[in-house]
Amino acid sequence: MGYNDDFIRIFSENVTRTGTQQLLDWLGTTDFYTAPASTRFHGACESGLVMHSLNVYNVLMQRYFEDTDNRESFTICALLHDLCKANYYKSGFRNVKNDVTGQWEKVPTFHVQDQFPFGHGEKSVYLIERFLRLKPAEAVAIRWHMGGFDDSVRGGSFTISDAYNEYPLAVKLHLADLEATYLVEKGTSSVNRR
């Protein structure tokens, strides 16, 4: 069973709200199941995005899910937090100098081609809401899952602090995303980082 089969199975088993099938149908028209998760770092490989989404789900459920938490909410947030990356990356090549031979070599790479520049977390929320109605905690968690890496936070916004104080799911999703990215997926890039 591949990543896309696991994704569809987990999503279908845990998410029952109106629009679920329409969202899955739409995902099938995008590159979500084959896209990388980043240009050069974690999951910079074919199917890196769906792999990363499943890793975030597994970390979130294994480390942070409590009896009082909502399984459907956790599933939606983990599996769809990076929906903004569907149809976002393009593959290509770049030249890198070989340290041993001194020759320039063409190596595969990914680059960003953002067709809808709406932000990161907020873009994921927007895309999800085209199909599923999100609960406030879900929308906030997905919006702020990047933590300190979010552009508005780097620009000086303190709203993230209010979000994390009010919505534990937002903190849990951010921590699961960090762990999946930097620990679980370490070494998953097929792209030369130079």
Where are these regions (language model features)?
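Divalent metal-dependent catalytic cores for phosphoryl transfer on phosphate-bearing substrates
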Residues: 39-43, 51, 62-192
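Non-catalytic interface/linker regions that flank or bridge core catalytic/transmembrane domains
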Residues: 1-35
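All-alpha helical catalytic cores of prenyl diphosphate-utilizing isoprenoid enzymes
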Residues: 22-29, 42-54
